[in-house]
């Protein structure tokens, strides 16, 4: 086992894709531009610990993009022959080995720091006897204890990287392999030492494909002004298309925003169904004429877009953040520059071939692609750590 020195990344870069030059066309995550299989991939068994957040069991029942990604990733890594141990709260729910971090954190505390800090503080002890080559941390606070457990660490930035979070991730990138979800996210923090860009993925066979769609459009996500629920209502009504709204609405800020800005607009052609998961979520995704994604922030990725596409459902979205990297305009959906363009795009959703939507997910955004990309990052991270640990000649 190689002990991480915290300095191995100085002057060193690993990546699943080359940097794009200034002004070049944005590369689509998962496309071949991210590179072929690493010819240096070894045959030695790779041992990885994947750390999930403290908020939900894996796999999640309803909302939980990070948890869904972690669940699909560890299962796909196991299928590739990687020895994976999942560190997560609650009960064992994947094919990976499991080490519980404790009970699921109180959902009333979601968004607060203490559960994250307590979760992170346990990691050195939990990792001490696992003998892993690399730790893949998907939490916010967990990377802060990397120096304590001394293991090479890969950190995925699952959220925004601007402002104070940018300062945080920039500092982390000095001693850990920092992974972006998209080129857009990476571009929001160009001063960080990004190690790789690895787009999210889903397991396609878990999403029911439907070629024939119903009339409704779907808004699915989190109840926040960033996600554009009011813009979704306005667009659907302007297009004369019924809208089904399903969103996580648990935290105080989410509830307050819903009651103030969204609830007064409901009724008639706009149906609120609350937070959904399981079969209900899949049926809504598969039956919708389109997923409406009118975001008002720099979205790092947008997992719900590839979930919809896996069901053969096109995406109608605003051009913010990673949207142009995920949605192929005119092939898997319509990317609009202004909210006023959304109604017309919704009326053209039938022009998108559902089979193309599914094919893009299978080719670029599958769990198999996700695992292959991360295995490449893990192996390179371990190799850099071994090289740094060698005594100077």
Task: State where each predicted segment sits.
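Catalytic cores of nucleotide-sugar-dependent glycosyltransferases that transfer UDP/GDP/TDP-activated
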Residues: 2-5, 10-393
């Amino acid at each position: 086992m190689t002990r991480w020195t915290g300095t191995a990344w100085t002057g060193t870069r690993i990546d699943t894709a080359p940097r794009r030059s200034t002004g070049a066309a944005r590369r689509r995550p998962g496309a071949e531009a991210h590179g072929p299989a690493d010819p240096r991939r070894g045959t030695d068994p790779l041992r990885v610990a994947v750390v999930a957040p403290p908020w939900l069991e894996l796999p999640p029942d309803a909302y939980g993009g990070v948890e869904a990604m972690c669940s699909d990733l560890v299962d796909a890594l196991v299928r590739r022959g990687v020895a994976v141990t999942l560190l997560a709260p609650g009960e064992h729910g994947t094919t990976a080995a499991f080490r519980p971090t404790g009970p699921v954190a109180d959902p009333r505390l979601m968004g607060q720091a203490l559960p994250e800090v307590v979760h992170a503080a346990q990691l050195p002890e939990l990792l001490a006897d696992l003998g892993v080559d690399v730790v893949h941390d998907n939490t916010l606070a967990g990377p802060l204890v990397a120096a304590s457990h001394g293991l090479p660490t890969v950190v995925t930035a699952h959220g925004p990287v601007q402002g104070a979070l940018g300062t945080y991730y920039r500092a982390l990138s000095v001693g850990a392999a920092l992974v972006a979800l998209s080129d857009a996210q990476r571009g929001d923090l160009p001063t960080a030492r990004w190690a790789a860009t690895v787009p999210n993925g889903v397991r396609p066979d878990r999403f029911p494909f439907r070629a024939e769609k119903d009339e409704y459009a779907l808004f699915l996500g989190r109840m926040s002004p960033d996600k554009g629920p009011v813009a979704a209502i306005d667009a659907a009504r302007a297009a004369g298309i019924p809208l089904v709204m399903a969103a996580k609405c648990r935290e105080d800020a989410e509830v307050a925003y819903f009651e103030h800005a969204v609830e007064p607009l409901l009724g008639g052609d706009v149906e609120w169904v609350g937070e959904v998961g399981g079969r209900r979520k899949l049926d809504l995704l598969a039956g919708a004429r389109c997923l409406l994604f009118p975001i008002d922030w720099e979205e790092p990725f947008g997992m719900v877009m590839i979930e919809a596409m896996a069901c053969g459902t096109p995406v109608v979205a605003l051009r913010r953040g990673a949207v142009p990297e995920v949605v192929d305009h005119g092939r898997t959906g319509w990317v609009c520059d202004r909210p006023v363009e959304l109604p017309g795009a919704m009326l053209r959703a039938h022009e998108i071939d559902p089979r193309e939507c599914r094919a893009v997910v299978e080719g670029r955004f599958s769990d198999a692609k996700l695992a292959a990309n991360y295995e490449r990052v893990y192996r390179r991270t371990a190799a850099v750590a071994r090289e740094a640990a060698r005594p100077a000649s």
